[in-house]
C-alpha cells in the first residue's frame, strides 16, 4: 500500500485539526473557570471598575505603633471601636479583652486613654461581647455597638455570657448603663432587634443611627439572610425607621460598616462590602457615591474642618484588586483624596488574605493626631502624628 505524501495540504489539515481541538479544550476550561462561584464577598458594583486605585500620595504622618498601655500588664486584643472623647484630647477604645472576644473575660473592654497612652478610666466587664463601633455624644455619653453574641464554645466556658450581644448600649461618662437598643443575645429585624450591628452615630440633634449588619459583606447575592440597613431612633430610643437594603445599587449596602457626619449634617456611610462611601441626608435620601477612598472599615470626619479619614484594613487582590490597605485622608466637601499612609509590614496574612496590616477603626483628636484600632494580624492601637501637614 502506498503511503500518502506529506504535502503542505496534509500538514496544514492536521495543524488545523489539532488547533481546533486545542481551541475547544481552552474554551471548555475557560467556561469551567467562569462557572466557578465567586469568592464570598468578592463581587463589586459595576461603577467600582471606573475608579483608578489611589495608592501613591504623600504621607505626612509619623507612625507610632503599640500605642497605649493596658492595666495589669495585659495585652491588647482586636480593636475596631475607637472615638475621641468630648474633650477632644482623650481617646476611647473597645479592646476585645486581649483576644477577639470578651465572652469569657472579666476585664473591662472599654478604656479611656490620655495622649501618652495611659488608661485613665475603664468599664464594661461582663456587659459587652464584641465591641465593634463607638460614638461619643454631645454630653459625653459612650455608645457601643456590640456586634455578636457568645458562641457555643464560649458559653460552655462561661454560661453567664448568654443573653448579651447584638445590641447598641448607651453608657454615661462614668460607665453606667443608661439604654439598650435591640434584644440582647438575639438577632432579628428592627425595631426590636439587630443582626450584628456595626456602628452607631449620634447626630447633633440627638437622632441615633445604627449601621446593621456585619456579615452582609461576605454575600454576593440577595437572599433571606442578606440584610443591610441603617436604622434611625429618637434620642429616647423610639424607633423612627430603617432605610437601605442588601445590594449593589446606590442606596443599597453590603455591610454599612462605619458612620460619620460632616459639618453640613450629611450622613457618610462606609459601605465596606461594596468598597465605597455613600452619602445621605439625615432622613436617608441618597446624595452621592464615592469609590476613591477604597474599601473602608473605619470612617471619621472632623466636624470643624471636614477632613475625612478613611481607613482600609482589608483590600487585597481577592477583595479589592489593585487597591492597597492603608489610611486615606481627604476632603469631605470635595471628595479629593490628599494623603495616603501605607499598611504596616507583616509576615502574617490578614483574615481576608494578603500581607500587611492596617487599622479597622479610626478617630482624630483636636490637634489632628490620628488614632487607629487594629484588628489583625497586628492588634492594639496605632498613633499617626502629623508632621508635614501645613
Could you say what each language-model-derived stretch is?
Residues 9-12, 20, 176:
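A periodicity- and composition-biased signal for non-globular, repetitive helical segments
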Residues 1-14:
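N-terminal secretory signal peptides that target proteins for export/translocation
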Residues 5-7, 29, 134, 178:
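A detector of low-complexity, intrinsically disordered, Ser/Thr/Gly/Pro/Ala-rich segments
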Amino acid at each position: 500500500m502506498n503511503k500518502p505524501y506529506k504535502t503542505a495540504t496534509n500538514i496544514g489539515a492536521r495543524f488545523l485539526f489539532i488547533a481546533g481541538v486545542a481551541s475547544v479544550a481552552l474554551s471548555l476550561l475557560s467556561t469551567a473557570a467562569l462557572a466557578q462561584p465567586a469568592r464570598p464577598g468578592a463581587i463589586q458594583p459595576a461603577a467600582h471598575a471606573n475608579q483608578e486605585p489611589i495608592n501613591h500620595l504623600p504621607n505626612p504622618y509619623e507612625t507610632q505603633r503599640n500605642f497605649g498601655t493596658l492595666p495589669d500588664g495585659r495585652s491588647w486584643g482586636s480593636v475596631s471601636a475607637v472615638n475621641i472623647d468630648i474633650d477632644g484630647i482623650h481617646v476611647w477604645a473597645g479592646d476585645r479583652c486581649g483576644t477577639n472576644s470578651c465572652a469569657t473575660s472579666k476585664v473591662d473592654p472599654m478604656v479611656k486613654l490620655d495622649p501618652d497612652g495611659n488608661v485613665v478610666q475603664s468599664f464594661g466587664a461582663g456587659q459587652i461581647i464584641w465591641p465593634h463601633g463607638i460614638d461619643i455624644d454631645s454630653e459625653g455619653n459612650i455608645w457601643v455597638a456590640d456586634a455578636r453574641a457568645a458562641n457555643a464554645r464560649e458559653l460552655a466556658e462561661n454560661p453567664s455570657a448568654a443573653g448579651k450581644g447584638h445590641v447598641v448600649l448607651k453608657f454615661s461618662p462614668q460607665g453606667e448603663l443608661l439604654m439598650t437598643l435591640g434584644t440582647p443575645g438575639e438577632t432579628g429585624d428592627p425595631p426590636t432587634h439587630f443582626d450584628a450591628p456595626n456602628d452607631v452615630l449620634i447626630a447633633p440633634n440627638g437622632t441615633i443611627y445604627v449601621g446593621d449588619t456585619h456579615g452582609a459583606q461576605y454575600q454576593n447575592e440577595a437572599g433571606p439572610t442578606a440584610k443591610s440597613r441603617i436604622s434611625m431612633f429618637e434620642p429616647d430610643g423610639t424607633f423612627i425607621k430603617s432605610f437601605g437594603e442588601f445590594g449593589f445599587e446606590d442606596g443599597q449596602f453590603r455591610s454599612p460598616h462605619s458612620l460619620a457626619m460632616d459639618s453640613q449634617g450629611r450622613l457618610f456611610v462606609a459601605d465596606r462590602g461594596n468598597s465605597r462611601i455613600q452619602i445621605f441626608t439625615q432622613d436617608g435620601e441618597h446624595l452621592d457615591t464615592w469609590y476613591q477612598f477604597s474599601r473602608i472599615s473605619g470612617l471619621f470626619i472632623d466636624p470643624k474642618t471636614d477632613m475625612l479619614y478613611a481607613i482600609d484594613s482589608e483590600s487585597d487582590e481577592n477583595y479589592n484588586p489593585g487597591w492597597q490597605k492603608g489610611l486615606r485622608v481627604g476632603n469631605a466637601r470635595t471628595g479629593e483624596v490628599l494623603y495616603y499612609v501605607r499598611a504596616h509590614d507583616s509576615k502574617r496574612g490578614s483574615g481576608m488574605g494578603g500581607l500587611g496590616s492596617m487599622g479597622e477603626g479610626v478617630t482624630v483628636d483636636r490637634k489632628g493626631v490620628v488614632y487607629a484600632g487594629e484588628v489583625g494580624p497586628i492588634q492594639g492601637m496605632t498613633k499617626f502624628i502629623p508632621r508635614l501637614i501645613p
